From Swiss-Prot:
Binding site for folate: G163, P164, S165, S166, F167, V168, P169, S170, W171, G172
Name used for this protein in its record: Formimidoyltransferase-cyclodeaminase
GN (gene name): Ftcd
Keyword NAD: no
Spans annotated as Linker: 327-334
Region (Formiminotransferase N-subdomain): 1-181
Superkingdom: Eukaryota
Family membership: In the C-terminal section; belongs to the cyclodeaminase/cyclohydrolase family.
Recorded GO CC terms: centriole; cytosol; endoplasmic reticulum; endoplasmic reticulum-Golgi intermediate compartment; Golgi apparatus; Golgi membrane; plasma membrane; smooth endoplasmic reticulum membrane
Amino acid sequence: MSQLVECVPNFSEGNNQEVIDAISQAISQTPGCVLLDVDAGPSTNRTVYTFVGQPECVVEGALSAARTASQLIDMRKHKGEHPRMGALDVCPFIPVRGVSMDECVLCAKAFGQRLAEELNVPVYLYGEAAQMPSRQTLPAIRAGEYEALPEKLKQAEWVPDFGPSSFVPSWGATVTGARKFLIAFNINLLSTKEQAHRIALNLREQGRGKDQPGRLKKVQGIGWYLEEKNLAQVSTNLLDFEVTALHTVYEEARREAQELNLPVVGSQLVGLVPLKALLDAAAFYCDKEKLFVLEEEHRIRLVVNRLGLDSLAPFDPKERIIEYLVPDSGPEQSLLDASLRAFVREVGARSAAPGGGSVAAAVAALGAALASMVGQMTYGRRQFDHLDSTMRRLIPPFHAASAQLTSLVDADARAFAACLGAIKLPKNTPEERDRRTCALQEGLRQAVAVPLKLAETVSQLWPALQELAQCGNLSCLSDLQVAAKALETGVFGAYFNVLINLKDMTDDVFKEKTRHRISSLLQEAKTQAALVLGSLEARKE
């Protein structure tokens, strides 16, 4: 799974289309950056850009946009309704896929330092990247706005994190940092604005003030009336959907509305949404209603229905889910995008990758998929009605493991590429040799981690496979036999891939611990596969 970071720079220009387009072009032409949205506000005189890419790519994209803005925006002439303190007012980095918050903090720091050095402008860090508590929030840093900067920069407490403490009239100052993904989510009500606002006050974390806090953490809220749709909305911002989820906000709003005898008529997501936010909601409704829904497409359709996301306008997942707008591949083509014929051809080509690690992952993924298939060939059939609850329990682990193992096909090739890249680093000076050694050891750790994860994933499947072998559709007997051997073979491949990469590692404690773990996982795979095959043979007789 490729890494994906979202960057949302806010530039202080919302009227001059030539400037807006020039900044868009600067982002779009940066390799590895995908521009998803450009939202220009004439009255605020501000444009919000949304683009994504791998960490190093989005830093370059933000810098390219800033360079362009420095030539075209003059803050001495800027007027607008939105608070601002610079030509590039704020530039947050947000983790979307395969990236930690710490990595986004590094993005913000790298961007801030390079921006300050290149343009010689003051830069502040906020959010998760803040260096001091007083700079945690954007409003705190932006207090007084652009007009206050000449005096503010003279104060010791407002020395920039990067760049000069001198006022740059044409630019102002920039704030950059890292934060969680913000989701704008509105619940529709057939009510008055005041009733909607009453619900919002009960829900939002701020509540009605310090003495009357609301129920939902990391949620902002207000009630308003949407004239063009002739209904009211509880309008919320979810500052961290992993603290308070979409479905939690919706269900709590419904409960509040029910107490006031008000009808809820769906909801609205504004802008883009992370896939995980919808899948978390799907898991909630599947659990609540005891539903058996496996496919991602079906789970999203369930959420659209339960939350009424299409009540005001069609909700097209391909246009609204951020991961769907960007292919899950890095700068190079993903092996998973290739046809089976092309994948086999590439394995057989005169190159070291994809190699045994990717093949082991593919074989294990097929083994898990076969087990899932057998479960589904048993589930929902009249003669196996008595097994429905059992299959509902057994199928999901195989379905999930198949997807996880499939992702390791690419992960193994990427880990090998990282090792190869480290080996090719220069080693002419002591510093270069140290840097190369560190990079190589880190690359080897990744090259060990991928096959170890394969073996650990398969290890979780043996109990379910044993049970499936004893009660699954007997007409699929050969499929389960192949599944057992495929899973065992995947672990067999993982074992040797771990050992070959451990050989060049220098951490003896890690080597011994990992060698012991992978050996036990291989022995377990051999034993469990034999037991599954024995159970199947006994049933055949």
